[in-house]
Amino acid sequence: MVDSMRYISTRDESRTEISFSDILLGGLAPDGGLYLPAEYPQVTGDMLDRWRKLLNTQGYPALAAEVLQLFIDDIPADDLTAIAHRAYTFPKFAHAEIVPVTKLEDGMYIGHLSEGPTAAFKDIAMQLLGEFFEYELRRRGETLTIVGATSGDTGSAAEYAMSGRDGIKVFMLTPAGRMTPFQQAQMFGLNDPNIFNIALEGVFDDCQDVVKAVSADADFKRAHRIGAVNSINWARLVAQVVYYISCYLHVATSNEQKVSFSVPTGNFGDICAGHIAKQMGVPIDRLIVATNENDVLDEFFRTGGYRVRSSADTFETSSPSMDISRASNFERFIYDLLGRDAARVADLFGTQVPQGGFTLADDPAFSKVGTQYGFLSGSSTHADRVVTIRDCYERLGIMIDPHTADGVKVARGLRNEVDTPIVCLETALPVKFAHTIKEATGREPDLPDRFTTIMQAERHVTDLPNDVDVVKDFIAAND
């Protein structure tokens, strides 16, 4: 247990420290920054040995409780244990291990993150977040209005995690017509009086901009008790740190062995948790950033230039959850890379990013991206995804979704630069992207039994224009 775990904003030069519970229900810091621990807790070899035994004997929830205690000191340990065990149960998760790891081929593994209720990796963080929110709201006697944006998987994971919970309403913005039929059915088929689906004109980043504008209106945020579940919420990252540790423990037989991860990446949330785990001292070798055609992050890790794309330059791809023009969690990594220089980060992300981006190509810190922080990157195309899905299915008998295929393709392309086992983090089950799977394999993906009725469900969704005030009015009218 950390003596005093406190959190600071990436843009706060005074490093004002606040508790986990005080950042849990919010998203952005008041100054527009993102929260990170004032110091990362450190993992020792003895802790890894204990956790390896714990994972083997008591399972994923027990490991999660121990990791959470490193980051949270204002919720009693017994309560954290109960929260973790409620979040990670079988059959809510379809596999008793919660996050099983299987071998794909020599030197490469799949970390199965999609066994949850909506078949996406985001269930792992969202189920924990739902428990945290309900616990903290009950403790405070308060209610919460969640306003979020999704390109597909986040929204359904959030809605299923928050559905039926006391004192929580959800308003989820989606880009109209940009999600797969299965994703739409999952979200819009949920019949809950406290869940509101909004189909917004535009792309995912337009949805995210509206959410940020709503959160930036301090009076509106206070009046309607607005909270966030998008990947900028710190509690989601904490939840994701756990599965990096569990995957590491599954693959590495001793603490001397290092493991690398290949992570399909859009918003830099999933791989940011890997960065945090590495900074904690978990023996992670390389962190491989795998993008699709929307290669904002690959471009940065190759050139040092972070160039925000316009909506018109954001491609609609067959791995749509990664169709982003800028990465909302990236600020956290840049804060660490620049020696936690809050003034510089505030300038980069508060001033330069809204004007199109920045470059660190000539900054001495950029050389640390690979050497100190372990990052590699690559991008993938639709043709790459189809070939990778077909190869995994025909040669290995394993069906993967298009986002996971991006991760596998990029990892294979960098195999000569990585001399440690690579865990490719799965992002979703193939059923969520049936069109691309059929194109690649000639057959429909299997539909897990738990989803057999979803496509016939009545739809619950409201179409709105890309207008912050109209969205605010809708929230106010239904809050």
Listing of model-derived features with the role each one plays in the protein:
Residues 2-479:
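PLP-dependent amino-acid enzyme catalytic core
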